[in-house]
């Protein structure tokens, strides 16, 4: 029998207890010292039989099971084990087999109790402080945290970008966001503007567009430029828009024309590509016409007549004078010198459907059609000129007499169509004619309806004549058999320019670049586009809309569009307004005709009264004239009756026009 006390006496380190310390867990191994106490393990110096060794191994394994509860609570400890402790005990076969029944198990039981107490205290600490335990996060939680961090970083970046952009632009005016969007869009454009060296293409109908620079008033209001001219035939309008959720964006509309001139183009460049090719036509026996069309204040008079300084004008830098100089240059060339051509000029205006001569104290003229269906302007005088300087004098004289008025866009706006004609005559016979027309500013009916009756009548007549002009040019371009030139006085006077094989026309559409004129600019471009109907990408449409959105939010709105019902109601009111204007114009003409008849056939009562003032007047003569006057008076009763009916109808038409105008103004105020 081996006594355990003897073994302990020989190897005291086998039963020596050490303090516990937590450490990383290791896999359980047999023949290792118990995990809850730190003790040195050495090989026993007392040999024993194999049964005793197996009994000890079993006993040690039993004690090692105390570690399991501690592992479940994530508190792991490890006792350092010497290298020798992992080796098996040496077994001496010469000794008898020891018995394990007499070995006392008190130290092992004490070790087991301490391990259980330690495990119990660990469980209590974990349950009392659940936050101290380290828990692994799931993959979903980690991904959500990553997304949150990315969103915060993106917001911070956007905030920095907004602050930087706000520093680059002046926030004192409300349209700086649109200015930034337009600037960013222009950076992406490939610009190839028109140059003087570009070839000149000849067209029977040439439609061009010219953009003027921002004027002093627009710069003072801090307006932005919404027009871009990326190429020699393409023009873009950056129309500001506002969504329902107050998101601002641009609708970029493209228009294609034969030539597009930006704000840097001079009058000389515009003339080179527009009116200059037409000068050759009149020397070949043809008729040529050049129009300047556009909104009030868009630069029509500057282009046609020259530089303006208040009401004075430098006519030498306008298309009128440039065309005159080229006419005299061609006239003196050898190929045309033998024709013995003489140059004449006329200058008249059409105001409110009436024709007035600008070179003869604004004498009123009549437009009639003779038996050969040729339109004649009765009383219009032609002035012979021998050089370009004479022409410039005539232009200055006529421009000073032109009818003008004040509008919302121009304090000195031309309210009439001015027509300057250069005629070539050979032995009194008309050889060619070049008509240069400075059209009145186009107005919306809704804008003119709020003014007085005179201004409303001006606007109605201007729009009527411009519509007739557009249809006449389209008929010329499409070679239609019928040309609606009788629709207005303007097309009547220019009738011979729309018929015949050798007729050419050029239209210069003038536009304003400011954001406040965007709607009027689009109306001008659509008018010019329908004259010829070119597509920006060789398609059937003349417009292409490309939207560029930005996430800028603002409560200010550029403008609200009308609903379908409101547009229909306003359209019906405008139709009534235009019908009333047409009736007024027709009745006015009838009243003038009746009055002329009465004046021509009626007696001169003033002459009879003056006759009686003479001391030696002939009484017989007086009686004869009085009887004749009374007879004529009876015959003219029907003319008086007709005039009375016309005046009543004219009064009714004026009342209808006034009522329609008030309805339109009321509708505009409610909007």
UniProtKB/Swiss-Prot annotation:
Chain spans, region Disordered: 37-58, 115-138, 533-568
Segments of this protein annotated with the region Globular: 1-200
Signal peptide annotation: none
Region annotated Negative regulator of microtubule-binding, chain positions: 153-184
Modified residues (Phosphoserine): 41, 55, 57, 61, 112, 121, 133, 138, 465, 576
Biased composition, class Polar residues, residue ranges: 121-132
Similarity remark: Belongs to the TRAFAC class myosin-kinesin ATPase superfamily. Kinesin family. MCAK/KIF2 subfamily.
Name of the featured protein: Kinesin-like protein KIF2C
The species this protein was found in: Rattus norvegicus
């Amino acid at each position: 029998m081996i006594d355990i006390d003897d073994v302990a006496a020989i190897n005291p380190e086998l039963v020596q207890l050490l303090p516990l310390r937590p450490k990383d867990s290791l896999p359980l191994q047999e023949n290792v010292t118990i995990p809850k106490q730190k003790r040195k393990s050495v090989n026993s110096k007392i040999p024993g039989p194999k049964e005793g060794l197996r009994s000890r191994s079993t006993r040690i394994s039993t004690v090692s099971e105390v570690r399991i509860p501690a592992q479940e609570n994530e508190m792991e400890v490890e006792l350092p084990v010497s290298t020798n402790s992992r080796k098996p005990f040496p077994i001496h076969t010469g000794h008898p087999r020891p018995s394990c029944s007499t070995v006392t198990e008190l130290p092992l039981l004490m070790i087991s109790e301490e391990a259980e107490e330690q495990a119990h205290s660990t469980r209590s600490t974990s349950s009392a402080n659940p936050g101290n335990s380290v828990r692994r996060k799931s993959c979903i939680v980690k991904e959500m945290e990553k997304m949150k961090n990315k969103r915060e970083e993106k917001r911070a970046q956007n905030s920095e970008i907004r602050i930087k952009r706000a520093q680059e632009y002046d926030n004192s005016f409300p349209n700086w966001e649109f200015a930034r969007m337009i600037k960013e869009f222009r950076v992406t454009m490939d610009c190839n503007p028109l140059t003087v060296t570009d070839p000149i293409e000849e067209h029977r109908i040439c439609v061009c567009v010219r953009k003027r620079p921002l004027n002093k008033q627009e710069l003072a209001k801090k307006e932005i430029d919404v027009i871009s001219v990326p190429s020699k035939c393409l023009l873009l309008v950056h129309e500001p828009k506002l969504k329902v959720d107050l998101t601002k964006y641009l609708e970029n509309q493209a228009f294609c024309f034969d030539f597009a001139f930006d704000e840097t183009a001079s009058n000389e460049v515009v003339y080179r590509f527009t009116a200059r090719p037409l000068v050759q036509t009149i020397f070949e026996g043809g008729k040529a016409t050049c129009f300047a069309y556009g909104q009030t204040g868009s630069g029509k008079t500057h282009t046609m007549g020259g530089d303006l300084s208040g009401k004075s004008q430098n006519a030498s830098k306008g298309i009128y004078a440039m065309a005159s100089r080229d006419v005299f240059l061609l006239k003196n060339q050898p190929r045309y010198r033998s024709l013995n051509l003489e140059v004449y000029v006329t200058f008249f205006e059409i105001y409110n459907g009436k024709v007035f001569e600008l070179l003869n104290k604004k004498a009123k003229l009549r437009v009639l059609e003779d038996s050969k269906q040729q339109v004649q302007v009765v009383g219009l005088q032609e002035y012979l000129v021998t050089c370009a300087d004479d022409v410039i004098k005539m232009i200055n004289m006529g421009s000073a007499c032109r009818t003008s008025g004040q509008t919302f866009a121009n304090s000195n706006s031309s309210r009439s169509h001015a027509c300057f004609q250069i005629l070539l005559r050979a032995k009194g016979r008309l050889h060619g004619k070049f008509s240069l027309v400075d059209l009145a500013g186009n107005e919306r009916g809704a804008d003119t309806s709020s003014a007085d009756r005179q201004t409303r009548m001006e606007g109605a007549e201007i729009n009527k004549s411009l519509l007739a002009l557009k249809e006449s040019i389209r008929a010329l371009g499409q070679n239609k058999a019928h040309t609606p030139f009788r629709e207005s006085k303007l097309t009547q006077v220019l009738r011979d320019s729309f018929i015949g094989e050798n007729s050419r026309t050029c239209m210069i559409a003038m536009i304003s670049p400011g954001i406040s004129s965007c709607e009027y600019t689009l109306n001008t471009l659509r008018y010019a586009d329908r004259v010829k109907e070119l597509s920006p990408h060789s398609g059937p449409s003349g417009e292409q809309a490309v939207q560029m959105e930005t996430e800028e939010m603002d409560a200010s709105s550029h403008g609200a569009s009308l609903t379908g019902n409101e547009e229909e109601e306003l359209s019906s009111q405008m139709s009534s307004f235009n019908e009333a204007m047409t009736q007024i114009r027709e009745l006015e003409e009838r009243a003038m005709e009746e009055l002329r008849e009465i004046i021509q056939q009626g007696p001169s009562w003033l002459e009879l009264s003056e006759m009686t003032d003479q001391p030696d007047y002939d009484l017989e003569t007086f009686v004869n004239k009085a009887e004749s006057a009374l007879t004529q008076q009876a015959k003219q009763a029907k003319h008086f009756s007709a005039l009375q009916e016309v005046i009543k109808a004219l009064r009714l038409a004026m009342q209808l026009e006034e009522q329609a105008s008030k309805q339109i103004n009321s509708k505009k105020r409610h909007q």
